[in-house]
Design a protein with these regions (language model features):
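Extracytoplasmic
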Residues: 27-29, 38-42, 78, 120, ...
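Sec-exported extracytoplasmic/periplasmic mature domains
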Residues: 2-11, 25-26, 48, 60-71, ...
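Proteolytic maturation boundary segments
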Residues: 141, 147-202, 206-207, 211, ...
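Second-shell loop/turn segments in exported
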Residues: 2-9, 41-52, 63-73, 85, ...
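Short acidic (Asp/Glu) and glycine-rich catalytic loops that position anionic groups and cofactors
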Residues: 39, 133-135, 195-207, 249-256, ...
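Acidic/histidine-enriched segments that form metal/cofactor-coordinating
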Residues: 19-128, 174, 181, 272-276, ...
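Structured mid-domain segments that build the active-site/substrate or prosthetic-cofactor binding neighborhood
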Residues: 211-288
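M16/MPP (pitrilysin/insulinase) zinc-metallopeptidase core fold and M16-derived inactive scaffolds
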Residues: 1-48, 92, 107-112, 223-253
Length: 417
C-alpha cells in the first residue's frame, strides 16, 4: 500500500506531490518517506521553514492517501515497477539477533519485509486498505513553527471527510520474555565481538505522576551505573574494551543492555572486569559524591531545558512523541515537566538510588554475544561460568523489580560510547 501511495499524487498535481516527498530526502539526515513495521505504517514529510502553504498541500496529500487511494491492477503494477522507497523497522528483519528475539512472539509470520506473493490480488489489497486504513486509527503529528489554531482547523476540514471505522480490534504485538541464558549469534551487524549483558521486564504504561517518578528514579539509577562503570574503566586504564548502554521498549517488553565491545581473545577477562564492578555496585551502592555530581548535572540540564528544546531537530521531536504514544506515556507540557522534574531531583537521595540499583542488578540476566560471521564460535559456557562466579552470590534483597524497572524508555543515557 505505501508503494502505491508513493506513485500517486493524492489530489495534487504530480509535480507538487513529488516535491513533498523530495523534501524528506535530506542527505545529512536521511529519513525514508515511509517506514513499515509489524503494527504500524509511518508516512514522513519534511517541509521548508515558513512555508505554511505547503503544509496545507501536505495535509491534503496525506488525507487522500489515507482514505482515497486508487487500488487497481494497473496502479498495483505501476507501483511494483517503480523504485521501492519504503523502509522497514527493524531495517533488517532477518538479522540474527532480531530473529532470536522473536522466538515465541506473536510477531512471527508478520515480517514487514517478506516478499510479495505473486500474482498480487488488487481486490485483496483494497479490502485490507478499507479494513485497516480507517481515520479512527490514524495519528497525525506536526512539529514546527506553526499556528496551532489554524492548523487544527485545517486538519478538521481536510481529514473530517474520511470515512470508515475499525470493526475488528488490531491484535496487540508482543515479544516473549527474554530468556536468561548465554547465547552466541553470528551476524553481519558487528565488526568485532559485542557482548550484551541484558535484562527485560513487562512494560507498564506511564499515565500518572507516581509512575513517572518511579520511572525517572530507575532511569537515573541506570545512568549513574553507566557513568560509574565508565569512570572505573578509565581510572584503571582498561584497554581493548568499549562500553555502551541501551534501554528501550520493544512491543510491551522493557529491555536494557550493557554492551561490551572486545577483541575475541580478551572477552572473558573483560566480562569479568565489568561483572566485578556491577557486583560491587549491587552490594555496596554508589558513593555519595558520584550521586551528588549526577544530580548537579541533571539540575544544570533542567535549567537549559527550553534552550535545548528549541534547538532540537524536528525529526527527533517527532521520534520522541511517537515513542511516547507507542509506549502509552502521558504527554507533559515542558513547563509541567520542568516543575515535576525539579521536585523529583530535590527529593532524591543516594539511598533511594542505591535501592533501585540493587533491585535492577539482582535480576537474572542474559549474556548475548554478537560475533562477526566467519569467526569461530565462542564457548558461551566459559562466559556464563565467569559471570556466575562473580554475580551468583545475590542476597534476597530484591525479589520484585518490575515496579521500578519496567520503564526504561526516553532515557538520558547515551545509547553508545
Amino acid at each position: 500500500i505505501p508503494r502505491i501511495a508513493l506513485t500517486q499524487s493524492g489530489g495534487l498535481d504530480a509535480t507538487q506531490a513529488r516535491s513533498l516527498w523530495q523534501q524528506g530526502f535530506d542527505p545529512k539526515r536521511p529519513m525514508p518517506p515511509v517506514i513499515v513495521s509489524y503494527d504500524s505504517t509511518l508516512y514522513n514529510l519534511s517541509l521548508p521553514n515558513s512555508r505554511n502553504d505547503l503544509l496545507k498541500e501536505s495535509l491534503s496529500y496525506l488525507a487522500n492517501i489515507s482514505g482515497n487511494l486508487s487500488i487497481t491492477s494497473e496502479t498495483v503494477n505501476h507501483a511494483l515497477s517503480s523504485e521501492d522507497m519504503v523502509a522497514t523497522w527493524p531495517s533488517d528483519t532477518k538479522e540474527g539477533w532480531w530473529r532470536y528475539r522473536l522466538k515465541g512472539s506473536t510477531l512471527l509470520g508478520h515480517d514487514p519485509a517478506d516478499p510479495l506473493k505473486t500474482p498480487v490480488d488488487a481486490a485483496k489489497i483494497q479490502s485490507f486498505y478499507q479494513k485497516w486504513y480507517t481515520p479512527d486509527a490514524m495519528t497525525l503529528i506536526i512539529v514546527g513553527n506553526v499556528d496551532a489554531r489554524s492548523v487544527a482547523e485545517q486538519i478538521n476540514k481536510t481529514f473530517g471527510e474520511l470515512k470508515g471505522k475499525r470493526e475488528t480490534p488490531a491484535p496487540v504485538p508482543t515479544l516473549s520474555p527474554l530468556r536468561a541464558e548465554a547465547v552466541s549469534i553470528m551476524t553481519d551487524a558487528v565488526r568485532q565481538d559485542r557482548l550484551s549483558i541484558m535484562w527485560d521486564t513487562p512494560w507498564q504504561p506511564i499515565r500518572e505522576s507516581a509512575a513517572l517518578l518511579r520511572y525517572w528514579r530507575a532511569d537515573l539509577a541506570r545512568e549513574a551505573l553507566f557513568w560509574h562503570i565508565q569512570q572505573e574503566l578509565t581510572k584503571n586504564n582498561a584497554k581493548d574494551i568499549g562500553l555502551g548502554f541501551d534501554c528501550r521498549v520493544l512491543f510491551l517488553r522493557a529491555q536494557c543492555a550493557i554492551n561490551v565491545e572486545s577483541p575475541n581473545d580478551k572477552l572473558n577477562a573483560n566480562l569479568g572486569t565489568v561483572a566485578r564492578e556491577l557486583a560491587k555496585v549491587r552490594d555496596k551502592g554508589l558513593p555519595e559524591e558520584e550521586f551528588n555530581a549526577l544530580v548537579a548535572q541533571k539540575n544544570l540540564e533542567l535549567q537549559k531545558l527550553f534552550a535545548t528544546y528549541g534547538r532540537t531537530d524536528t525529526d527527533i521531536l517527532i521520534s520522541q512523541r511517537l515513542r511516547s504514544l507507542q509506549n502509552q506515556v502521558v504527554d507533559i507540557a515542558p513547563e509541567q515537566y520542568q516543575r515535576l522534574r525539579q521536585s523529583f531531583l530535590n527529593s532524591l537521595s543516594v539511598e533511594m538510588l542505591n535501592q533501585d540499583l540493587r533491585q535492577q542488578l539482582s535480576q537474572d540476566m542474559a549474556l548475548i554475544l554478537l560475533q562477526p560471521k566467519g569467526e569461530p564460535e565462542f564457548n558461551m559456557k566459559d562466559l556464563q561460568a565467569t559471570w556466575d562466579s562473580i554475580m551468583a552470590p545475590v542476597t534476597a534483597a530484591a525479589t520484585s523489580v518490575e515496579t521500578d524497572e519496567s520503564h526504561p524508555e526516553v532515557t538520558d543515557i547515551p545509547p553508545v560510547q
